[in-house]
């Protein structure tokens, strides 16, 4: 059974940093492209980026490429999202997804909530 478990979300102040993790199990993690996607409150899904199996190719949505870094550790079956310079509009549920060979998201995690607030 394919399982994806995100963690690392929480409350972060504007301008701060946060690192999300996604632990994968039930499949050969090292063979698959992986992706991060987010959904802000009341909004649709927004693709953040994707990484190929050996980390040689990483693609980002243009507006996020200067503040988010996607990486992976195949030995630990874990995908990462390093977030920096966060703003209130980065408040969202963050999901990792295993991509199908044809590019669509075949499996999703349950998500981890990131809230950006000064309070």
Curated annotation (Swiss-Prot):
This chain was isolated from an IgA myeloma protein that binds galactan. It comes from Mus musculus. SUPFAM superfamilies: Immunoglobulin. GO terms for molecular function: antigen binding. SMART domains: IG (SM00409), IGv (SM00406). This is Ig heavy chain V region X44. GO terms for cellular component: extracellular region; immunoglobulin complex. CDD domains: IgV_H. The keyword RNA-binding does not apply. InterPro entries: Ig-like_dom, Ig-like_dom_sf, Ig-like_fold, Ig_sub, Ig_V-set, IgHV. Pfam families: V-set. GO terms for biological process: immunoglobulin mediated immune response. It comes from the Eukaryota. Keywords: Adaptive immunity, Immunity, Immunoglobulin.
């Amino acid at each position: 059974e394919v399982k994806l478990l995100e963690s690392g979300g929480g409350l972060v102040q504007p301008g701060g940093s946060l690192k999300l993790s996604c632990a994968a199990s039930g499949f050969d993690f090292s063979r698959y492209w992986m992706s991060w996607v987010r959904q802000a409150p009341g909004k649709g899904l927004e693709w953040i980026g994707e990484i190929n199996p050996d980390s040689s190719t990483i693609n980002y949505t243009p507006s996020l490429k200067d503040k988010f870094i996607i990486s992976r550790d195949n030995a630990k079956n874990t995908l990462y999202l390093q977030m920096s310079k966060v703003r209130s509009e980065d408040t969202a549920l963050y999901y990792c997804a295993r991509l199908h060979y044809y590019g669509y998201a075949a499996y999703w995690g349950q998500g981890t909530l990131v809230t950006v607030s000064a309070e």
